[in-house]
Amino acid sequence: TPEVNESGDTRRRTTRFGGGQPRARRPVTDALLRDPPAADWPSWRRTLDGHGYSPLDQIDRGTVTDLRLAWVVSMEEGNNQATPLVHDGMMFLAHPQNVVQALDAATGDVLWEYRHPVPDDAAGFGATRTIALYGDKVFLATYDAALVALDASTGDVAWETVKADYTSGFMHFGGPVVADGVVVSGINGCGRYKEETCFI
């Protein structure tokens, strides 16, 4: 039976599954984001310079025909544009509708799942394009213009900051990035110019 942690708010729901156990992880540091281990993909496009290059060389032109399906996981219904992030054998997936999952990268077993339900009057129809890892946290920018920090081992909510009033048209589709310990997050919806202009 999945274990559910409501975190004192029914909008903040984390479910831990029996497919795997929360594990201790090395914290994601600035040095790791600049030069990650070969098997890690800790940020969008892997490194801060955005090259999107993996140094792994086991799969090449001679071995690509040997690839076989190892596991599969269903994604939430909607527009999937996310980059899976990988650190210390855990994969972090951002789904549409502000759902985040942590999986065992080797087996596909779901370790935990966080759902940030979107208010009925928020613009919750687009992709959740990426999330960010730093320290022991996973950062999610939500459709209702909040920034949520999750414990990377358990999925529990560490903190949440509301950045703007979603009823004025502000929202997030792009994800945050972390640089020098600072979480940087833009905002969408500024083209509506109801009360404010764009900001980061």
Model-derived segments and spans:
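Aromatic (tryptophan-biased) beta-strands that constitute blades/sheets of beta-rich domains
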Residues: 11-75, 109-118, 156-165
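Short loop/turn segments that connect beta-strands within beta-propeller blades
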Residues: 104-107, 151-154
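Extracytoplasmic beta-rich repeat domains
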Residues: 72-85, 113-135, 160-175, 190-195
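Repetitive beta-architecture junctions, highlighting loop-to-beta-strand starts
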Residues: 39, 54, 98, 145, ...
